[in-house]
Amino acid sequence: ITEVCNFKCGYCLPNGYMADKSDNRKFLHIDEIRRLAKGFSELGVQKIRLTGGEPTVRKDFFEIVKILKNETSIKKVVITTNGYHLDQKAKLLIDSGLDGINISIDSLDRETFKNITKHDRLPEILKGIQILQDLGFVNLKINAVLLNGVNASTKDFNAWSDFIKKNKVNFRYIELMQTGDNLDYFNRYHISSKIFKSYLNDNGWIYQTQGLDAGPSLNYINPDYKGKFGIIAPYSKDFCKSCNRLRITSKGDLRLCLFGNTGISIRHLLQKDDQTEELKDLILGQMRFKKESHYLELGETGLTKNLSKTGG
């Protein structure tokens, strides 16, 4: 719902958010988002994830969530957030009706976290997670991008293991993905998630069979732990096999794949309430172009200049 982010993570926006001067379109208006959700819900979509950038920087963020929950047939509304104001907004997030919250925390080491994000906010974010748990919110996930020589050591893995032993949180490592403008960073820091998979196998974690509606994470459980571990490995052979996702950019472009080479604007069909049937027809017509796989392993990153553009 926005490309704006207040963090400066090295793998995404190392210099912070800078507006794209070649594209002067504004971000989707709340009414356009409502019409979009209505069309998708009538096509059978049951879950919407709000991403960015950082979605909570939008002044109408909570209003967007409430509209999706109360004025559409979408069953689950979830967000991915950096948690910058999590300690201050935890109750507001719950009261808005959100069904799930994914928080990006690349390290439990305060200095490492600061070096990656350029913000010293780890204590406040962890406090926010505790507040959410104290208020009874249970659908919490934490994502970390796996970075060679930064947060991919046994010490890092043990720290997260200790964390989820006491906290009912799903923690997932995401393999660093190459985008259009991070090739040097990718070459320096990419490491296969197999290193974490080996750690899990060596420490008694058991692979959990996925349901039909599951996401891309390979999940592992241990009866001695409250939380779960997960791996998101976009370079693995069967990563795209069960893909059930479509993406809409903050400016109204439909993307069939995070790393696809094509995208079309559907914004012209979000201007009036009576355009729903046209919108649905256009979306269904595009589905036949959804490919079986991305081509990341060949270095083809498609239209994704950085992940804030497509909601990675």
Residue locations for each model-derived region?
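Residue-level recognition of short loop/turn positions
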Residues: 8, 52, 251-252
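Auxiliary Fe-S-binding modules of radical SAM enzymes
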Residues: 159-166, 176-312
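Canonical Radical SAM [4Fe-4S] cluster-binding loop centered on the CxxxCxxC motif
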Residues: 2-30, 258
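Radical SAM/AdoMet-radical enzyme domain recognition
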Residues: 27-50, 54-172
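Glycine-centered loop/turn positions within well-structured domains
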Residues: 7, 110-111, 238, 264
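Residues that scaffold the ATP/ADP-binding catalytic core of kinase and kinase-like folds
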Residues: 8, 12, 58, 111, ...
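A short acidic, helix-capping loop that chelates divalent metal ions and anchors anionic groups
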Residues: 18-23, 109-116, 180-184, 265-267
